[in-house]
Design a protein with these regions (language model features):
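Conserved N-terminal phosphate-binding loop of PLP-dependent enzymes in the Aspartate aminotransferase
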Residues: 1-149
Length: 149
């Protein structure tokens, strides 16, 4: 949520999904999941009692989600991402230009990756030894997902 510079990535493309899920970022560390749909879809697909959950309605989780959404708006997180993301893009593009084994930068906002010609496990391990945390996405992509704030 917010990582691409919009609250949800679909907002970059001029479409509105009929159904969407949200989870991890919605709780900012508190386990939560949400299944959202338009009223039009809900009217045609769900009746009372069709969709239930063991933990649904938990007040603690509800309060956490409320605070996360409040913080996202209050602290202008999406605007901040739009402001700082070009720096990450520029630096990753510079790395791709500098090293032949890097073939391209992918992603948007503060969810970026660089594609490598070979598996990246050793690179991620060496980066960690040097104090840089990167994760892999598949066998040949280094993913960079810095904090939103």
């Amino acid at each position: 949520m917010g990582r691409t510079g919009e609250m949800f990535a679909w907002q970059h493309y001029g479409v509105k999904p009929d159904i969407m899920t949200s989870a991890k970022a919605l709780g900012c560390g508190v386990p939560v999941g949400a299944f959202l749909m338009t009223e039009r879809v809900a009217e045609k697909s769900l009746a009372p009692g069709d969709h239930g959950t063991t933990y649904g309605g938990n007040p603690f989780v509800g309060a956490a989600v409320d605070k996360v959404l409040e913080m996202m708006e209050r602290d202008h997180i999406t605007e901040h991402v739009k402001k700082v993301a070009p720096y990450l893009e520029k630096k990753l593009d510079e790395l791709v230009a500098k090293y032949d084994f890097l073939t391209e930068r992918r992603g948007m906002g503060l969810m970026q990756g660089v594609v490598c010609e070979k598996p990246v496990g050793q690179i991620a391990a060496k980066a960690l030894e040097a104090g840089l945390i990167v994760i892999t996405a598949g066998s040949n992509v280094l993913r960079f997902v810095p904090p939103l704030i």
